[in-house]
Amino acid sequence: MSGQTIFDKLWNQHVIAGQEGEPQLLYIDLHVIHEVTSPQAFQGLRDAGRSVRRRDLTYGTLDHNVPTKDIFNIQDLISKKQIDTFTKNVKEFGIPAEAHGGKGQGIVHMVAPESGRTQPGKIIVCGDSHTATNGAFGAIAFGIGTSEVEHVLATQTIWQVKPKRMKIEFQGHPQKGVYSKDFILALIAKYGVDAGVGYAVEYTGNAISDLSMEERMTICNMSIEFGAKMGLMNPDEKTYDYVKGREYAPKDFDEAVSKWEKLVSDSDAVYDKVLTLDVSQLKPMVTWGTNPGMGLEFGEEFPKINDDLNYERAYQYMDLKPGQTASDIDLGYIFIGSCTNARLGDLEEAAKIIKGNHIADGLTGIVVPGSRPVKRAAEELGLDKIFKDAGFEWREPGCSACLGMNPDQIPAYVHCASTSNRNFEGRQGHNARTHLCSPAMAAAAAISGKFVDVREIV
């Protein structure tokens, strides 16, 4: 009998009812909520006269609609209603949640790990696709719909069909100036945005082992842009060190680690599909089009039109053409933030490049820490001063310009170097043009006024 993957082990431990191949009822260890996908779910509970089954396993924060310039001055009526409704709901149903502007408030996929709630062995859900971020800790983590949010609130369970298993091995040692954001963008560019459909992806290889927990979260975060249901990694000493000492870390930590150490894939585990990517010669990545798969290594020419891949429409929307390169893009905005790349390490990498320099004329740059703990830590290190002295705006935590649901929208027809995860049409604002890249690439572009090879700077 062959061994099991970490995904198999975790899934099987949480099955309450049902057979493999059909919907199975899973127990949920942590349910994280925010203001956008929870209002209808709470109203459903209210209408049915139900309560939240496990308030202690539920946790909320505000992120999507929160303004980052003046957090309490919410001009948009829908945004204000969602924030006010969330605050009312968590109070009424007795759910632990970060207050608007509170000490732990931030992007949902950042505050769960930072508080120590995210741990190996858990199944974690949230009404948000990038919940997969938590998989970096050796957890099953995936996004759910609003009706499922209500079901989990009421029962602490969810019905799911078990995905297939995919292993992706990142091999080699990257060059200086190449980061985990480049790993995942390269993977999506090579295999496509639907290559992971129907799979739970396990990331492995020496290139993964070498990454920090923050860098690992970046990769798991963008599993969704690869098309996967979720992404996860085997826990190791870096995982345990990250969790240790945090507010909600296990009280008997050594005992917890002894259990977590068993939650790794067996050497003879079987996968439905295996992919490999050598990162040793990988160059910094930049997207040119309107999905994350439309990306290239810096210096490569934009491809010829391929109607099967919607290239013609992408070129029209982005106002670019085949044969150009990333350095030809006329940038107007720089956004360093989002649940993909707004952690302390991301800000530190960007600040190293920015320090002593100034943002190029004609550019607008905003830096948005992903959470209040990150903001405080960055300010203690003086990173805020580095960015402000260079001409950047230093903002309050939130989802910000990752998506057009708050005031931080990129103006129409303006090209933005963005550390976020999606470059769809209108994602950052009506007719905004998004180019995904690492924080270091965004910082280098801010100084130069255009995309440059950050390997020549770091």
Curated annotation (Swiss-Prot):
The lineage of its organism: Bacteria, Bacillati, Bacillota, Bacilli, Lactobacillales. The keyword Protein biosynthesis does not apply. Catalyzes the isomerization between 2-isopropylmalate and 3-isopropylmalate, via the formation of 2-isopropylmaleate. Heterodimer of LeuC and LeuD. CDD domains: IPMI (cd01583). This is 3-isopropylmalate dehydratase large subunit. Its EC number is 4.2.1.33. It is an enzyme of class 4 (lyase). Keywords: 4Fe-4S, Amino-acid biosynthesis, Branched-chain amino acid biosynthesis, Iron, Iron-sulfur, Leucine biosynthesis, Lyase, Metal-binding. Binds 1 [4Fe-4S] cluster per subunit. It catalyses: (2R,3S)-3-isopropylmalate = (2S)-2-isopropylmalate. Belongs to the aconitase/IPM isomerase family. LeuC type 1 subfamily. Pathway: Amino-acid biosynthesis; L-leucine biosynthesis; L-leucine from 3-methyl-2-oxobutanoate: step 2/4. One of its GO terms (molecular function) is metal ion binding. Its cofactor is [4Fe-4S] cluster. GO terms for biological process: L-leucine biosynthetic process. [4Fe-4S] cluster binds at residues 339, 399, 402. It holds the Pfam family Aconitase. The keyword Secreted does not apply.
